[in-house]
Amino acid sequence: MAKILIFGNSGSGKSTLAQHLCKTQGLAHLDLDTLAWKLTSPPERKPIDDSEEEIKTFISSNDKWVIEGCYTDLLKIVEQQSTEIIFMNLPIESCISNAKARPWEPHKYKTKQAQDDNLAMLIDWIGQYTERNDTFSYAAHKQFYDGYHGHKKMITQNVPTEQC
């Protein structure tokens, strides 16, 4: 049974690849953005224990799944249950281009305009990927990838999803 973790910078193609795998392999999909944050303005992270409970409910309800996000602290919760990881390690310029071309994500934003209003902040966030030292950073993602002992793949450029 496929149990796949996909991670990388914002705009790296995590959701696109996850959606493709869901369609082609019949996997259940969990976007960690949907459970990592409180519904506050400005956004605030939920306690890890709350997110962990939701993740465990998801994996216990599904035999095969793909979980995607940039949160290594949350990915570690299901690392042992996964069968494969995919590190979307695209250049920052590609991530920015992808973010600019991103279709509306109604599960994250009430309107396309709200998503577009957040774009400048997102581009800045993407650009800081290699400079940050948090759970969302390149350093954290590389450490997670290097420490994983199962099947793993690193994708370093935009490619058609069929080739992933």
Language-model features: where?
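NTP-dependent small-molecule kinase module
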Residues: 24, 128-164
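Glycine-rich phosphate-binding loop used to anchor ATP phosphates in small-molecule kinases
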Residues: 51-96
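Walker A (P-loop) ATP-phosphate-binding motif of ABC ATPase nucleotide-binding domains
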Residues: 3
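A glycine- and Lys/Arg-enriched "phosphate-lid" helix/loop adjacent to the NTP-binding pocket
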Residues: 90-136
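Conserved substrate/cofactor phosphate-moiety recognition/catalytic segment
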Residues: 19-63
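Hydrophobic anchor at the beta1->P-loop junction of P-loop NTPases
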Residues: 6
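Conserved lysine of the Walker
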Residues: 14
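The conserved Walker
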Residues: 10
